[in-house]
UniProtKB/Swiss-Prot annotation:
It comes from Mus musculus. It is found in: Nucleus. Coiled coil: none annotated. Residues 784-795 have a biased composition (Polar residues). This is Lysine-specific demethylase 9. There is a cross-link at residues 290, 313, 734, 774 (Glycyl lysine isopeptide (Lys-Gly) (interchain with G-Cter in SUMO2)).
């Protein structure tokens, strides 16, 4: 019969599929010797004649494959549909991959095999390179093989035939693993779809698929026991998409380590001797000229001894009270725990040309555009008492200095920490003067209760927590004696403590800068006064105190009790602790005149002390030159008390609007132990941030009230010009005010042309409103008063 190469290949495949290894070799030998029959006859093997399944398989393989209408091969008779699908996918995928196109049918690999992982995936599905069952995949992927030979292509292990008693077809036992040979270079190529195929030139490169079941280690060696040749390391892609080899990455890492060590060796290690908490002036970090430190006194062995010696030299220089050139504030050392704003303020020194210029700091606020003057007591602690007085004079002269329009240059001046030597105001009066009557408001109500300062101190102590207390504020009390409806008393010991400060000694109502000449401090009508505020806070309705005064309910309230929805019922109440914009002034009516103000702040502590001073007030001050514009924009009623001069609160939106209109302002936060000075014509508003006890008073500066000196100069000039002696007459100038009515007499010499009283105050009337004058003779006057009896009369 006729025999072709294709028939021989199919016979080999059939024998290899169903027979064991030994029987497959024998069948191949018989086929080579001519023992095979034609394509339309059955081949019966002697050893396998009893197995019907084997006969069916051999008959199906020996049958001539006829293509269908579409040009595809018909499925084999004895092959299951699953095997046919695998053969079709393998054939179509291989042909497409040969043409450079990926196969349309996806491989049968499980989804986890598409992602490269280092775990053992288990048995792999058949691929193009190494099929699990050696079948017709190899002839489809490779060109026609050479003439058949007896030597097999490679050591292959075929599944044994099923037992004679079994009737099922293709029931294979688990595959056995054979020893793998050496892996040649270029054995497998990486495809973009993670498929592997054998090389075209080497028929032995097609390794059976059971080699793929071996575990792989990280170093590329197989765990089968036989070491393989390591494949070249793949290039890894970095973040930028560039590929770099692993050895290059290791080299770069080593170079970086070497550079880092080299830099550490070059820099050297420097020990930190001081912590942040001790980096102060007293820690030995001050700068002293090198001429003072002699080389013989220094210990070159220890750096700590050097710093200790420097500290001792600083202390000696401080005791000697040397000049500011020899002992100055260090430039590089600042006090600890300073905020960024405070640090920037301390860096800006005001160049006054004096030796105290390093202690005066000027702040130009970028938002508001106004100027603020600052001084810090921790820097002034180096000064002697005499130098402190000289510095106070210079600082206050700058504070109240004015331009040609009689407007102050600075909106506010602050001496931070200047009141630290004073005791807590509330504790002082509660323990030393417990029966002093005070007027106390009820929190959130308009009722006023009169109690003692000791009882008020107890309520504050009971409700104080974290900077605020939930008791009513204490209204102002006078410290220089109560007049009419005022509350307070005269406390000379406390006033003496205030005068210990050089800043307060000059700016008290009877101070050296004041125009008043009082015989006793109790005659002052400008203060000081003291009051206590709890701080702005939100208070739940359950914590709101009830009013002690019962009032009759109206019919409207009784009707509202029928239905109160929870949405409309307030659950908490905002307690506003604010003083709206106002201008400090003295006098009423035509005697109204703006004046300066001084204040001292003491936070209510009750045992909660901290290194950093607590913020107590949030202040907004407008520039004195914009006084008229601010009065018009805010609609101020200057003749009202300070509490009711303005009806609206100036917030950030209003400030921004006024700033766009050219009005300058300064926003400052005042802290515990601060002393502040406000020049005249400066409109300001206060908001209490935390519980604070405040002192305040007005000061009538000599530069604001030059009336008495002008009157005396005019009197001397008139006495020199007048040559006639006539009976002396008394001119009584009566000034009427709302609070009091005082009379003042000026003794002058009568002349035929007596000058009117308005000429005596010609210079003062240019900037102040005219008071009401009454001229009477001395004979008709029933009462006589001297100028020294009432020196505090505003004129």
């Amino acid at each position: 019969m006729f025999r072709s190469t294709r028939t021989t290949d199919q016979w080999r495949v059939g024998e290899r599929l169903q027979c064991p290894a030994g029987h497959a070799r024998a069948a191949l030998a018989r086929t080579a010797d001519g023992g095979a029959v034609g394509p339309f006859k059955c081949v019966f093997v002697g050893e396998m004649a009893a197995q019907v399944g084997a006969v069916r398989v051999v008959r199906a393989v020996a049958a001539q494959e006829e293509p269908d209408k579409e040009g595809k091969e018909k499925p084999h008779v004895g092959v299951s549909p699953r095997g046919v699908k695998r053969q079709r996918r393998a054939s179509s995928g291989g042909s497409q991959e040969k043409r450079g196109r990926p196969s349309q049918d996806p491989p049968l690999a499980p989804p986890h095999r598409r992602r490269r992982s280092r775990q053992h995936p288990g048995p792999l599905p058949p691929t193009n390179a190494a099929p699990t069952v050696p079948g017709p995949v190899e002839p489809l992927l490779l060109p026609p093989p050479p003439p058949p030979s007896l030597a097999p292509a490679g050591p292959t292990v075929a599944a044994p035939l099923p037992a004679p008693g079994t009737s099922a077809l293709f029931t294979f036992s688990p595959l056995t693993v054979s020893a793998a040979g050496p892996k040649h270079k270029g054995h497998k190529e990486r495809h973009k779809h993670h498929h592997h195929r054998g090389s075209d030139g080497d028929p032995g490169a097609c390794v059976p698929g059971d080699l793929k079941h071996k575990d792989k280690q990280e170093n590329g060696e197989r765990s089968g026991g036989v070491p393989l040749i390591k494949a070249p390391k793949r290039e890894t892609a970095d973040e930028n998409g560039k590929t770099q080899r692993a050895d290059d990455f290791v080299l770069k890492k080593i170079k970086k380590k070497k550079k880092k060590k080299h830099r550490e060796d070059m820099r050297g290690r420097r020990l930190k001797m001081y912590n942040k908490e001790v980096q102060t002036v007293c820690a030995g970090l001050t700068r002293i000229s090198k001429e003072i430190l002699t080389q013989g006194q220094l210990n070159s062995t220890s750096g700590v001894n050097k710093e200790s010696f420097r500290y001792l030299k600083d202390e000696q220089l401080c005791r000697l009270n040397l000049g500011m050139q020899e002992y100055r504030v260090p430039q590089g050392v600042q006090t600890p725990f300073t905020t960024h704003q405070e640090h920037s303020i301390r860096r800006n020194f005001l160049k006054t040309g004096t030796k105290f210029s390093n202690f005066i700091h000027e702040e130009h606020q970028s938002n508001g555009g106004a100027l603020v003057l600052h001084a810090y007591m921790d820097e002034l602690s180096f000064l002697s008492p005499m130098e402190m007085e000289r510095f106070s004079e210079e600082f206050l002269a700058l504070t109240f200095s004015e331009n040609e329009k009689n407007a102050a240059y600075y909106a506010l001046a602050i001496v931070h920490g200047a009141a630290a030597y004073l005791p807590d105001f509330l504790d002082y009066f509660a323990f030393n003067f417990p029966n002093t009557p005070v007027k106390m408001e009820i929190l959130g109500k308009k009722d006023i209760e009169t109690t003692t300062i000791s009882n008020f101190h107890t309520q504050v102590n009971r409700t104080y927590c974290c900077g605020t207390y939930r008791a009513g504020p204490m209204r102002q009390i006078s410290l220089v004696g109560a007049v009419d409806e005022e509350v307070g008393d005269y406390f000379p010991e406390f006033l003496d403590m205030l005068e210990e400060s050089p800043f307060l000694k000059m700016t008290l109502p009877w101070g050296t800068l004041s125009s008043l000449q009082l015989q006793c401090r109790s005659q002052s009508d400008d203060g000081p006064i003291m009051w206590v505020r709890p701080g702005e806070q939100m208070i739940p309705t359950a914590d709101m105190p009830k009013s002690p005064f019962k009032r009759r309910r109206s019919m409207n309230e009784i009707k509202n009790l029928q239905y109160l929805p929870r949405t409309s019922e307030p659950r908490e109440v905002l307690f506003e602790d604010r003083t709206r914009a106002h201008a400090d002034h003295v006098g009423q009516g035509f005697d109204w005149q703006s004046t300066a103000a001084v204040g001292v702040l003491k936070a209510v502590q009750f045992g909660e002390w901290s290194d950093q001073p607590r913020i107590t007030k949030d202040v907004i001050c407008f520039h004195a030159e914009d006084f008229t514009d601010v009065v018009q924009r805010l609609q101020l009623d200057l003749h009202e008390p300070p509490v009711s001069q303005c009806v609206q609160w100036v917030d950030e939106a209003k400030l921004n609007q006024m700033r766009r209109e050219g009005i300058r302002y300064a926003r400052i936060q005042l802290c515990d132990n601060d002393i502040y000075f406000i020049p005249r014509n400066v409109i300001h508003q206060f908001k209490t941030v935390s519980a604070v006890c405040s002192l305040a008073w007005h000061i009538r500066l000599k530069q604001y009230h030059p009336v008495v000196e002008t009157a005396q100069n005019t009197e001397s000039n008139s006495n020199m010009d007048c040559g006639l002696e006539v009976d002396s007459q008394c001119v009584r100038i009566k000034t009427e005010s709302e609070e009091r009515c005082t009379e003042m007499q000026l003794l002058t010499t009568a002349s035929p042309s007596f000058p009117p009283p308005s000429e005596l105050h010609l210079q003062d009337l240019k900037t102040q409103p005219l008071p009401v004058f009454k001229v009477e003779s001395r004979l008709d006057s029933d009462q006589q008063h001297s100028l020294q009896a009432h020196p505090s009369t505003p004129v």
